Amino acid sequence: MSRTRNLARPLALLALLLAAAALSACGYESEEKEVVEGEPVTLGELKYNVIFSRFLNPDDNEDSAYLIGQPTPPPGSAYFGVFFEVQNESEEPQTLAEHFTIHDADHQKFEAIESESLYALPFGGEVESQEQIPVLDSTPETGPIEGSLVLFELPASASENRPLTLEIPGPEGPAEVTLDL
């Protein structure tokens, strides 16, 4: 038997296995509910993506727009913003989560606070069919970060107790997003 023929059979088998693996992955979407900032997570019919998170400075011109109506944070604490894009790819309006929570490595929990800012994500609001939050051409969508804000007040020590994990409730259970702090 020739050397070429000896190699042909294993190569053909390898090609067949690779083709089968590629076909089985077609249309695959992850059901992962633990992601890192920048990776989308699907909850029900909504796809949430934390596009950016950071501490906010009330004395900064850009940040002051995110903090409209908020009092000066107490000593030892600071405002923290989590900026989202949420997609509804379904044929029906979908309801956004009504609350958001951050956990630190010491298992302390911090609840999101209401915001009067034009950039605020509307807790419990609706996302129309085939639409997104922030709505196209809206203030948050055209702003510097291009996302809707969920606001937290965190102790200054929170940055020392990393990772910070954002919990988003969903119809089949919560998702967790590890924030890039």
Task: Put a short name on every predicted segment.
Residues 2-13:
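Bacterial N-terminal signal peptides that target proteins for export
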Residues 21-25:
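C-terminal motif of bacterial Sec signal peptides marking the signal peptidase cleavage site
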Residues 26-181:
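Conserved functional micro-motifs across diverse proteins
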